[in-house]
Amino acid sequence: MKILVTGFDPFGDDKINPAIEAVKRLPDEIAGAQIVKLEIPTKFNVSADVVKDAIAKEKPDYVLSIGQAGGRFELTPERVAINLDDGRIQDNAGYQPLNHTIHGDGENAYFTQLPIKAMAKAIREAGVPAAVSNTAGTYVCNHIFYQVQYMRDKMFPDIKAGFMHIPFLPEQVVTRPETPALSLDDDVLGITAAIRAIVSRDGKGDIETIEGKNH
């Protein structure tokens, strides 16, 4: 089994992005699966092509994209990607879309094929906080989540794909009082646990357990 794991470069006012820093530190093999690591730019109009080229070259069984979610306390496997770009800030190319449909011939939303409940459970069992999330936002994280799902729908039907957000690093919250942070070691531990869950649930679907939210 081969798993492509992507992480974004820094964006906004931050000089570091825990996503790519954690991805770079993953082992090359987890639970018998080969791990292919890829840095992608935080740019709406470029990121999808970078991932598409990697999928075409590597032919992975799974794609797991990692992104930063400042303000969240836990690692959060994402349930659904929506067909909308609505940038709160400019991306790294200076582009800021407003209520922009990603693909006119795409679905309004795509649900992940990853076992997100099993992933959240495995992360918590590794001693790292985790919860299933029902919104990946409308910035480049949701964009690449949706784009990979669109690729699966139109071009790469055999892959399974999804997205997971991770919190700020401690050094990112020095001037952000009361903002949650998680160490890079815990990020790596949590992502590794999530990948182990992906491998162990391959061909079995997700586990049946409560991870829903009221709001």
Curated annotation (Swiss-Prot):
GO terms for biological process: proteolysis. CDD domains: Peptidase_C15. It is an enzyme of class 3 (hydrolase). It is found in: Cytoplasm. The active site is at residues 78, 141, 165. Disulfide bonds: none annotated. Removes 5-oxoproline from various penultimate amino acid residues except L-proline. This is Pyrrolidone-carboxylate peptidase. It comes from Lacticaseibacillus paracasei (strain ATCC 334 / BCRC 17002 / CCUG 31169 / CIP 107868 / KCTC 3260 / NRRL B-441) (Lactobacillus paracasei). The gene is pcp.
